[in-house]
Amino acid sequence: MAPAKGSSLTPIQVENLQFPASVTSPATAKSYFLGGAGERGLTIEGKFIKFTGIGVYLEDTAVDSLATKWKGKSSQELQDSLDFFRDIISSPSEKLIRGSKLRPLSGVEYSRKVMENCVAHMKSAGTYGEAEATAIEKFAEAFRKVDFPPGSSVFYRQSTDGKLGLSFSLDDTIPEEEAVVIENKALSEAVLETMIGEHAVSPDLKRCLAERLPIVMNQGLLLTGN
């Protein structure tokens, strides 16, 4: 892709959270562009309460792998296609997911729901076994002593070889070192599946991905406004 001819990807604001158009991780020295961002919340007593803003960052190599199948499709077509989001999840490029808190949450409180969703998906997909149960235990342990005040973040790095790197920050800064790396491909993919897959916790994030990625696939990638 020739950047000079590409489309301009801009940052995204989710409530008071800013998601830059691109980031570079000091832990890996890799750069990622913002595929999309959106809110996650729950309806409590008839009122929608926003708890988290989620941003999905992709390596630029993801664009070509997605474009071979999805270039030329409309945003609505992509939003309506589960296969599109599954292709993002399984694309042969590294992903970095940032989950930043809008309300205070304990690590145990936050991770419990994430783990429930991941285990439910893996069981339904037939990928949950002894290794995955052990990986879930490591996941729980990583969050046990963590608290999330408003504005704090968890970063999930999903490597192409199935590793899931976790890091924690009191703001939106990517830590220089990861807190833990869990070697389990099924769990790694399940984290993103629960966010943008069949039973997505953030329809807003899915909509944003379906709106932004067609522009990149059709016009190339040019990052602005970091």
From Swiss-Prot:
Q: What one GO molecular function would you report for this record?
A: chalcone isomerase activity
Give the enzyme class: isomerase
Keyword hit for Glycosyltransferase: no
EC numbers for this chain:
5.5.1.6
Query: SUPFAM superfamilies of this UniProt entry?
Result: Chalcone isomerase
Family, as annotated? Belongs to the chalcone isomerase family.
What is the role of the protein in this entry?
Catalyzes the intramolecular cyclization of bicyclic chalcones into tricyclic (S)-flavanones. Responsible for the isomerization of 4,2',4',6'-tetrahydroxychalcone (also termed chalcone) into naringenin.
Protein name, entry field: Chalcone--flavanone isomerase 1
